[in-house]
Amino acid sequence: MSTSPHGRSQTIADVAARAGVSPATVSRVMNGNPSVDAALAERVRAAAEELNYSASPLARSLVLGKTNTVAVVVPDLANPTFHGVLRGLSRAASHDGYHILIADSAEAVAEERILAAETRRRCDGLVLCAPRMAEADLEQLLEELKPVVLVNREAGSTSTPVIAADYRTGLVELLNLLYDYGHRSLVYLAGAPQSASNARRLEGVRAFLDDHPDTAIQVLRCGVNFADGYDAAERVLASAATGVLAFNDLVAMGLMSSLNERGVNVPERISVAGFDDIPFARYLTPPLTTASVPVTELGEQAWHRMWDLLNERAPGHPIIFRPRIENRGSTGPVRPHY
């Protein structure tokens, strides 16, 4: 719909009157229906151009039965990791003429399911980033809301496409790094209990302990954000550990901030490693050792899988990215005098 020079909105009826056809014919032409005679279609387009008329996106979506929009539900929009996923996904979607609708569940499991259902009703597809809901609930939802793509969560018994990082391997490699520095007393600051990626990290802890019986790792319940890491400092110091692996970079940064306020030197007194390699991890003092996850590529691949589903093509096998260890200044050898 557009506005005439006299301020009145032009409608599909105006175009129909100008072209001498029915409104239904205008609708078919404006939405690319090939059944309309070519000469008639050209007359309609000329009338629309004269009136500066274009069909509204809402009207077009009602006619075509699609919105050219895909919903993305994330558990924590404040986390820069999800920014990277969204950046890659939205850029790739835009290339194919699609838009992204973003919803943040704020780590609330009950809210997550509601958001997924509501946003899916308004969009052509759904991408779930690291959903926190229970496996049975997730599998039921995946069947109800197709097409769906999962990011950083396994699909269980469904055929839903999965794009994820190998958090188990990443954590084992960080533990190996600290082990090679001589650390034998470690702490893992665990993420949200309902987080599947936290479960994979815990698998890494157990696998490492099986191979290194001379090492002790205390698992402390923590969280996923800066404040959680900050608040964990007292428990970390009470553990007498010489090295800490945080659930993610935000937790590691919060811990380092609190340790700094207490006069505890990193890494002289205690080594700290994060996970994800968010954009400012390398600019901390000291720069944060972490496992780098290619989040933008994760988002791009999630869109490619969704595009396959939208076009009724088989989406292919799961894509699992192996994190790359970035050994920086927040980790180092055990200091005997401590």
Question: What do the predicted segments below correspond to?
Answer:
Residues 42, 51-116, 122-125:
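Amphipathic helical "hinge" segments at domain boundaries
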Residues 119-125, 238-243:
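Short acidic/histidine-rich motifs immediately flanking catalytic phosphotransfer sites
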Residues 125-138, 153-159:
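Acidic, Gly/Pro-rich loop/turn segments at junctions of secondary structure
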Residues 72, 101-103, 127-128, 188, ...:
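Short catalytic-loop micro-motif centered on adjacent basic/acidic residues
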Residues 106-109, 129-134, 250:
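Short beta->alpha connector loops
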Residues 12, 23, 41, 55, ...:
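A general structural signal for well-ordered alpha-helical segments in protein cores
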Residues 1-5, 50, 88-96, 143-150, ...:
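Bacterial carbohydrate/catabolite-sensing allosteric modules
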Residues 1-68, 335:
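N-terminal helix-turn-helix DNA-binding module of bacterial transcription factors
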